[in-house]
Amino acid sequence: MIFMTAGELYLIPFFIYVFSYMFLLLRKKRFYQVFISLIYSGFIIQSLIFFIWLNLRGFKGMMSVDWIVFFNAWIIMIVVVLFNLFYKAKYILIYITPIVAINLLLGFFAPHVYINIKSIFSNFDQAILLTHIILILIGDSLFALAFIISLIYIFQERRIKIKKNLKLFDKKNHPFDEVFYQGKGYNLELLDSMNYQCLKIGFPLITIGIAMGIYLSNSLFKSFMIVKPIEIISLATWLIYAVLLHERVAKGLRGKKAAVFSIVGFLLIISSLSFSFYLFPEFHGFK
């Protein structure tokens, strides 16, 4: 591994995830188990890459753009694996792993340019920045999962109305269907419950993360009056999820409407990231 660049290392779990879907398409019980094993193998390799990087470089006041993207992919996978273990809903691995794979590919193409935060922030503020990044990424990962679950909910609800179960394939009487689709898999109540848990855990993390970001902005610019596009979009995203959480807790909002709110909120997050990394080269106000 020492003879490979960081970007090349990111491609190892990427190709494992892509390769795993070949076994899924075969639609055999034994191949489905291979698919799951490959997904977990990819996650283990992601984890090894992260901890090797941590051991070699650590957090010494320098962060590269490609590493942040890779770290985001790793956090998403941690969230999905934990939800799968807790809810026993393996189908979420099928739907969200492609997002992880895309992040790994973006990490490969992202510039290996280090952001020297040591020259910008004090040691205390560096710790705040690291915590800010971790909380935002975990919160965004939970919202990404809520986005996927919301899409599944909407499509499954529609399929129920026409008395069909949501499937990746339409063939009937296949052993793979018995293994994967029966049980509590696409139960609407379970989907709604997972959606709510993503919101309930993710919203406080995002709130604390945004508050830390505001503190860091004030520390950097010595003023709360400098407002950047990323902050406006972050606030808009926060308001969407704040309204959604309020409606769910105070008014018992559930089902399709809650799913639509989650989808809109996540699309705003995607817009926020686009503004940060592509439309504004000096994202967050520093190079």
Question: Where are these predicted regions, by residue range?
Answer:
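Interhelical loops and loop-helix junctions of multi-pass membrane transporters/channels
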Residues: 116-129
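Membrane-interfacial segments
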Residues: 155-165, 219-224, 284
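Short hydrophobic "helix-edge" motifs at membrane interfaces and signal-peptide entry regions
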Residues: 54-55, 121-123, 218-219
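Hydrophobic cores of alpha-helical transmembrane segments in multi-pass integral membrane proteins
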Residues: 3-116, 136-155, 168-181, 191-216, ...
